[in-house]
């Protein structure tokens, strides 16, 4: 076992709620490390909608998931948090009062006084479409999320699906791609009506293609696609040139090892005290989409509020003998000094 990394607080999840919690804890002189199963910072914002607009962040009329992540990282820079990406927490062992020993699937060990679970609903995994051999092209021509729109410039792009994600990316990537072919198993879409109307207008004007059926075969070399075969509902097959594919078959969410940490669960969510966002285990808190309480709204702004209240209780575990006085960043010279603004 490797030597333990000691920290005041360990946050599981580096999405917006986890990042803002770093800010609130940093104002209270609390040292933080974060662990995330993803290979990037930002949680759902980075994985699912990095370039899609978000309209309900207070004071910001519109911002992308990527933009929000970057702004939060800039905000917490004075507190110098440490990130551990591509790692999943496997075990949590109580070693003190307070105190936990936490291990990851990479063999890393942490010792912390407080554990904050900000892992969304668990880890998101895209549903793989039932196409023989598609896994061979994952990480190459087959993408389950759009992280950089420029990756699809001048591509023969096939988008598979009939929901909002599929239609949104048809419309957003149409100006960049060489040609887009949308494939759906039926001529009936579960997307916003105005998106469907715009897509049909592009098809009618010959600017993109729509095939009703299912992808049954892929051609290519290594991880690079060259064509995909679509079988129509009438049994006819069409081979389409395709060097990039975006399948949108939904996502599965796995709670993972959180279920084994001794936390009470309700429908795979963690009940919390709404005054502190502490779980049934003293010293373990849950903020963001992973928690539940009466009136819970799964909004980013709700997670920010939860992180602020969590920090006020967590600091008492870190500094049990310290009198903590609540201060405002607008008027406290000591807080402004921590933020580097005076």
Curated annotation (Swiss-Prot):
The keyword Nucleotidyltransferase does not apply. It comes from the Bacteria. Keywords: FAD, Flavoprotein, NADP, Oxidoreductase. Its cofactor is FAD. Disulfide bonds: none annotated. FAD binds at residues 17, 36, 44, 49, 89, 124, 289, 330. Signal peptide: none annotated. Its EC number is 1.18.1.2. Binds 1 FAD per subunit. It catalyses: 2 reduced [2Fe-2S]-[ferredoxin] + NADP(+) + H(+) = 2 oxidized [2Fe-2S]-[ferredoxin] + NADPH. GO terms for molecular function: ferredoxin-NADP+ reductase activity; flavin adenine dinucleotide binding; NADP binding. Homodimer. Belongs to the ferredoxin--NADP reductase type 2 family. This is Ferredoxin--NADP reductase. It comes from Rhodopseudomonas palustris (strain BisB18).
